[in-house]
Amino acid sequence: MNPVAFSIGSFEVRWYGIIIALGILIAMTLVSINAKKKNLNFDVILDLFLWCFPFAIIGARAYYVLFELENYHSFWDMINIRQGGLAIHGGIIGAFLTAFIYCKVKKVDFLAYADIVAPAFILAQGIGRWGNFFNQEAHGGQVTSEFISKFPEFIQRGMYINGAYYHPTFLYESIWDIFVAILLMIILYNITDRYKGVVISAYISLYSLGRFFIEGLRTDSLYFMNIRVAQLVSLLGIIIGIVAIIIIVSRGKKKRKGIFIN
């Protein structure tokens, strides 16, 4: 499979970049719809994007390099992302911290904006996973031809690498992410404003739940003391998300208000 969509002179335009751009475009469109529904200022979202996107890239790269330090021998190697090496957890952490700081400085309601962004963010993640497909990366271990035959033919071709078939873990995560995006949209449009933070908390816990199990199938995991880093971070995400939901809902009930819009 050719990861290059087309070339302009010596400059290669890769499918990965096209798909990421498409994911961002769709996500921003969805956020604009959510902002209008919740009477929030979309200009704030645009400002957040301009700040969060570069710091998400920095976070994704720093996270990856941190656990692969032995493979990098110069500062240029560390910052050269053209050769790959971005970790989604690092990107999420980078974007989350940047958004939190921005909202504090600008005195913007962080949870309100985080809730309308969460469904779009995980939808973009689900779309972005198809970039891994074109790069033939982020796959699982070897599988039999009988197993892979259950998938569409183009998936079979894409997962045939160096004479063997592999688990299309990118597909598993993409499906899970899109499912979670739909679920978060349902929650967002039906929950009262008294429960701000529930949607972003559900995102953290549900994304982490899917990633925890899918990570166990992958062959390119980052490790810390023989522990898959992504599974450890996902486990923490599940706990943090669930605890946050419990706290938010319990506080809301004390106000004697219903959880859902009538």
UniProtKB/Swiss-Prot annotation:
State its Enzyme Commission number(s).
2.5.1.145
**Ligand binding (a 1,2-diacyl-sn-glycero-3-phospho-(1'-sn-glycerol)):** R129
- Entry's Gene Ontology BP terms: lipoprotein biosynthetic process
Q: Which GO terms describe its cellular component?
A: plasma membrane
EC class of the enzyme, as a word: transferase
Q: How does it sit in the membrane?
A: Multi-pass membrane protein
In what pathway does it function?
A: Protein modification; lipoprotein biosynthesis (diacylglyceryl transfer)
The UniProt keywords, alphabetically, are: Cell membrane, Membrane, Transferase, Transmembrane, Transmembrane helix
Any transmembrane segments, and where? 15-35, 40-60, 83-103, 108-128, 169-189, 197-217, 229-249
Report the subcellular localization: Cell membrane
Does the record's keyword annotation contain Transferase?
A: yes
User: Which InterPro entries does the record match to this protein?
Assistant: Lgt (IPR001640)
Any one Gene Ontology MF annotation carried by this entry is: phosphatidylglycerol-prolipoprotein diacylglyceryl transferase activity
Q: Which family does the similarity line name? A: Belongs to the Lgt family.
Query: Which HAMAP family does the entry mention?
Result: Lgt (MF_01147)
PANTHER family (UniProt xref): PHOSPHATIDYLGLYCEROL--PROLIPOPROTEIN DIACYLGLYCERYL TRANSFERASE, PROLIPOPROTEIN DIACYLGLYCERYL TRANSFERASE
Its function, per the record, reads: Catalyzes the transfer of the diacylglyceryl group from phosphatidylglycerol to the sulfhydryl group of the N-terminal cysteine of a prolipoprotein, the first step in the formation of mature lipoproteins.
Designated name of the protein: Phosphatidylglycerol--prolipoprotein diacylglyceryl transferase 1
Taxonomy of origin reads:
Bacteria, Bacillati, Bacillota, Clostridia, Eubacteriales
